[in-house]
Amino acid sequence: MPGWQNCPMTLSPSHPLMDGRTAESPLISAYRGLKPSRRPVWFMRQAGRSLPEYRKAREGTGMLESCLLPELASEITLQPVRRHDVDAGIFFSDIVIPLKLAGVGVDIVSGVGPVLESPVRTAADVAALPTLEDSALDPIREAVALTVAELGTTPLIGFAGAPFTLAAYMVEGRPSRDHMGPRSMMHADPETWQALAGWAADVSGQFLRAQIEAGASAGQLFDSWAGSLGRADYERFVAPASVRALDGVRSLGAPLVHFGTGTSEILQPMRDVGVDVVGVDYRLPLDEANRRLGGTVPLQGNIDPALLTAPWEVLEAHVRAVVEAGSAAPGHVVNLGHGVPPTTDPEVLTRIVSLIHSIEP
């Protein structure tokens, strides 16, 4: 049920989608299943450690602090757009930022990832969770506004972690290999799980809505850990929370993208939460993903990050194969099938962008 097609836009007249800046950009055209003026491409984690200018900008500043300093977050978001000529900026943030803004004790520990002061594992823990106040989102709005002012006709994509991934971090208290904690809670204590997933859905939706209202031209929901779930559990315990998160955003009318890793078997229910575009990781060819989805939505993806260090002729052949497979879908935005590895040579990404733009849309 694509969001933008069924919702009148409620954005301000000065929003980039409304004032003519981005509505006909290659990215937004492809997201809407229309023929773009050139093939759009951007990269998940394009703003990050692969760029020397990013490492310099972040010197002495922690990850979460970097996300909450509007001028720094804006500069980091803009860096790969300047360098690579990609067709979108992706807002620089972290999945756990909405938790931090709500007042949940969380930090990024080097070599580990997000770590919570107190995991959330009981009904009492969930009941004690704070509310995300609207004013807490002001640094996000400011960063988006600064970024959009610089991007001009290049759209900004808003970013939020999906409720399951947020809740999984909260139950485990840190990254996990098998996500046994949240998967067990779904069945052992479904009421507590539902309450936690609902809380996560609300903060995720608030976070994404704030970015789009402030100027982002699209939004992407990242469900990093959804691939750990079987289809039945996803549909019963996770999809309703993702619907709830997007319900707070869909009325804005901006295109919405849904991406997770290892999600080849749940692409249909991921689409059915109410998005316009489905991101596909590197494990499934795009023509097969399109077949599974019945040719109903544009796709995004799915260059294998492992090939970024391959000889150029090997990588070029792979990129061309991705473009060819993507042509089966109603629309295609080229991306990686995962985030940019920190050790990636930035020149390789620039070269991929040039190659994509040289292929007729």
Report each predicted region and the residues it spans.
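Glycine-rich, proline-tolerant flexible connector loops at the mouths of alpha/beta enzymes
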Residues: 90-107, 120-121, 127-133, 160, ...
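Active-site loop segments of alpha/beta catalytic cores
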Residues: 136-361
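A gly/proline- and charged-residue-enriched helix-loop-helix capping module
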Residues: 111-149, 154
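N-terminal small/glycine-rich loop or linker at the start of catalytic domains
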Residues: 34-65, 95, 100-112, 118-122, ...
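Short gly/ser-rich anion-binding loops that grip negatively charged ligand groups
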Residues: 63, 67, 130-137, 262
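N-terminal basic, low-complexity leaders that serve as flexible interaction/assembly modules and, when applicable
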Residues: 4-110, 346-361
